[in-house]
Amino acid sequence: MLGPDNAFWDDGEWVSWNDINRQIQYKEWGAKYPNADRSLIPIFEDLLSVAEDYHDTTGSHLQVYGDIGELFGAITYGVKLHRNYAQGSDGRLGDDFVEVKTITPFKSNDYVEVKASGNFSKLLVVKINQHFELSCRMISRKNLPKAKGGKHRINWLEIA
């Protein structure tokens, strides 16, 4: 029930503070993630929070970092994700197929490997550090190092 404890009267109706806070949050997301499908942002934030809380509570990691990386690519670059387990790439950005690889907080090095046979023209590498802060870098396939054993191996520091 809306009333003076959780809302204010404006133009003949009650307006809840929750509605105002949601609108403010929506605007802040727009400023932080201008390319995002904003409906994905709360899912991304909740999933990241659950992963961090689980790690803080148990000392173990959930197997969700790939999904977190893909969602981060969707909200930071506007990558349109394919259905789960689609072969060759994780999504599209305009006319480019994008493969997303995630460096997890527990990984001992900052390398990712991607199959040379994959159907992608851009590689997005998302790094989640031990404090669960994210950053990402994108590289064109033509700028990847030469493949060895059917895989490209890319160091985070080598991506411009």
What are these regions, as identified by a protein language model?
Residues M1-A160:
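Nucleic-acid endonuclease domains
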